[in-house]
Amino acid sequence: MASIAVCPGSFDPVTYGHLDIIRRGAKVFDKVYVVVLNNSSKKPLFSAEERVQLLEEVTKDLHNVVVDSYQGLLVDYAKSKHASAILRGLRAVSDFEYEMQITSMNRILNEQIETFFMMTNNQYSFLSSSIVKEVAKYNGNISELVPKVVEEALRKKFAHAENHL
């Protein structure tokens, strides 16, 4: 039986930290579904469709990675894809506390799906989409934080927003 994992996130936008986890996960699992979820507590800069397009572009060399979007419970999505695992990246201890809550709830909802945590490489331990957006908003250098296509999309978003003030 093939090992299938779901790697969820808001990916608003996708960063090198996200890609680190996706690439490493693709080496461990036979198939990885990278699924864009909408976090109801966040207002996204990019639409779900835009985030899917960016993820497809930056993962196109990973032949066992499929990008998708979903609204609903992650465990329901995982079950629909016959996934037995949820893959999550951890940056710091503070991430772990939040992730434990989510993992515990997912286990209550579906005990057949295991959550696997992967530590982000040290060079990305500080990195978050929020930080990237803040730096990009003020024209800071983000070339070492996100792929070129994401950097261009951010510059375009913020230039468009500035022109409509």
Curated annotation (Swiss-Prot):
Keywords: ATP-binding, Coenzyme A biosynthesis, Cytoplasm, Magnesium, Nucleotide-binding, Nucleotidyltransferase, Transferase. Its cofactor is Mg(2+). It catalyses: (R)-4'-phosphopantetheine + ATP + H(+) = 3'-dephospho-CoA + diphosphate. InterPro entries: Cyt_trans-like (IPR004821), PPAT (IPR001980), Rossmann-like_a/b/a_fold (IPR014729). Its EC number is 2.7.7.3. Substrate binds at S10, K42, L74, R88. The record marks H18 as: Transition state stabilizer. ATP binds at S10, F11, H18, G89, L90, R91, E99, Y124, S125, F126, L127, S128, S129, S130. Pfam families: CTP_transf_like. GO terms for molecular function: ATP binding; pantetheine-phosphate adenylyltransferase activity. Belongs to the bacterial CoaD family. HAMAP family: PPAT_bact. This is Phosphopantetheine adenylyltransferase. It comes from Anoxybacillus flavithermus (strain DSM 21510 / WK1). The lineage of its organism: Bacteria, Bacillati, Bacillota, Bacilli, Bacillales. The gene is coaD.
